[in-house]
């Protein structure tokens, strides 16, 4: 049965590292849909309402659903732009949906970003400009990672949650 895991949060919070760790752990049968790859690399789209990455992300997730894959949707996915698409995916996958949000302080995201290999790609000033505080979906099943949650703790939590659905 297909399962959907949505991992959201501000730039530099650890979403990509977590999603890649999940994909490595589960291996074949896992579809990782990274917002940066779809929006920026594949389509060269801007972050704006109606951008083509919304439909492509949904289509890829539907492919995963049709093929009974574990679908990992990872990215910033600002609610004012992406909430309708995420709601449709939630409806499609039903109770096989898990959603997580990195609810970190700005200072923690900067600290995490400074440990990354790609830290030169954008600055703390860029991060501040893009920052959206507590951009929650408002779903009952949405869970949160806080400053004190390590990559390993977040990973273990999702693995345990997946075993329950």
Segments and roles (model prediction):
Residues 7:
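Hydrophobic anchor at the beta1->P-loop junction of P-loop NTPases
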Residues 93-112:
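Conserved phosphate-donor/acceptor-positioning beta-strand/loop module used by diverse small-molecule
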Residues 16:
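Walker A/P-loop
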Residues 13:
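ATP-binding Walker
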Residues 20-66:
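Conserved substrate/cofactor phosphate-moiety recognition/catalytic segment
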Residues 10:
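P-loop (Walker A) phosphate-binding loop of NTP-binding proteins
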Residues 115-159, 165:
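Small-molecule kinase domains that catalyze NTP-dependent phosphoryl transfer to phosphate-bearing small molecules
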Residues 52-94:
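Glycine-rich phosphate-binding loop used to anchor ATP phosphates in small-molecule kinases
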């Amino acid at each position: 049965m297909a399962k959907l895991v949505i991992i959201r949060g501000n730039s530099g919070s650890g979403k990509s590292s977590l999603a890649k760790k999940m994909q490595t752990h589960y291996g074949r049968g896992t579809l990782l849909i990274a917002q940066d790859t779809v929006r920026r690399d594949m389509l060269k789209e801007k972050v704006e309402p109606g951008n083509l990455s919304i439909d492509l992300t949904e289509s890829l997730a539907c492919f995963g659903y049709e093929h009974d894959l574990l679908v990992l949707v990872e990215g910033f996915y600002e609610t004012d732009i992406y909430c309708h698409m995420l709601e449709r995916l939630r409806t499609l996958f039903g109770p096989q949906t898990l959603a997580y949000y990195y609810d970190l302080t700005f200072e923690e995201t900067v600290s995490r970003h400074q440990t990354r290999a790609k830290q030169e790609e954008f600055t703390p000033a860029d991060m501040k400009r893009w920052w959206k505080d507590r951009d929650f979906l408002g779903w009952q099943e949405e869970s949160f990672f806080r400053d004190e949650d390590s990559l390993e703790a977040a990973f273990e939590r999702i693995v345990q949650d997946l075993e329950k659905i």
